[in-house]
């Protein structure tokens, strides 16, 4: 068995850190990227990973990461946000920031590692949300951005085949830090879940 190198953005989130743990437990080498230095260091030390402190909203973030790791088998872009507002309170900056976080920076990551992924017959995993396909109140910002991520996924899957696999996961609410305020609201939980259930299942 040969250890593969994987790169995870959004490593301090529940999904990113869980994925990192699974990959490490399977004998792979994992490099984590997070903007919170203390949390990223803590997770890296716990799992035995290398890491880079970088914010995907800042210019030049991809060069900073590539200086630390240049050759990978796969990348998971687990960065996300839950920005819920009624349309009357939404402004252009809200959309721009959300698109930058969820779409534009993901594109930069994929472009930055495209040659390495092609050489290694690698894979890309992106994340959307069930809200991109189902209408939820106050989700205009995030649903629009994640729908764009889904469009990017199918386009790149066709463009990069058969050398690079590109997939997108679109969960409902997950039992994570970012979703904690919504999970505490039972009415919201029932409304945003396909069926009434515990999101940790």
Describe the function of each predicted region:
Residues 110, 145:
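Active-site helix of classical SDR
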Residues 135-143, 155:
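Active-site loop-to-helix junction immediately N-terminal to the catalytic Tyr of the SDR YXXXK motif
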Residues 86-87, 91-96, 189-190:
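Substrate-binding pocket helix/loop in short-chain dehydrogenase/reductase
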Residues 191-201:
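Single conserved hydrophobic/aromatic residue that forms the stacking wall/gate
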Residues 12, 20:
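N-terminal Rossmann NAD(P)H-binding glycine-rich loop of SDR-like oxidoreductase domains
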């Amino acid at each position: 068995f040969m250890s593969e190198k994987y790169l995870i953005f959004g490593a301090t989130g529940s999904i990113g850190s869980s994925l990192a743990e699974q990959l490490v437990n399977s004998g792979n080498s994992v490099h984590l990227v997070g903007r919170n230095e203390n949390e990223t260091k803590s997770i890296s030390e716990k799992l035995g990973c290398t890491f880079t402190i970088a914010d995907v909203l800042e210019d030049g973030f991809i060069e900073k990461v590539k200086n630390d790791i240049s050759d990978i088998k796969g990348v998971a872009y687990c960065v996300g946000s839950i920005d819920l507002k009624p349309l009357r309170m939404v402004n252009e900056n809200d959309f721009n920031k959300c698109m930058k976080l969820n779409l534009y920076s993901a594109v930069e990551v994929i472009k930055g590692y495209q040659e390495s992924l092609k050489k290694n017959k690698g894979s890309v995993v992106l994340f959307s949300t069930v809200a991109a396909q189902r209408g939820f109140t106050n989700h205009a910002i995030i649903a629009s951005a994640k729908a764009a991520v889904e469009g990017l996924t199918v386009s790149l899957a066709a463009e990069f085949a058969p050398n690079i696999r590109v997939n997108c996961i679109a969960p409902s609410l997950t039992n994570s830090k970012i979703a904690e305020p919504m999970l505490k609201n039972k009415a919201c939980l029932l409304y945003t879940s396909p069926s009434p259930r515990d999101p940790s299942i």
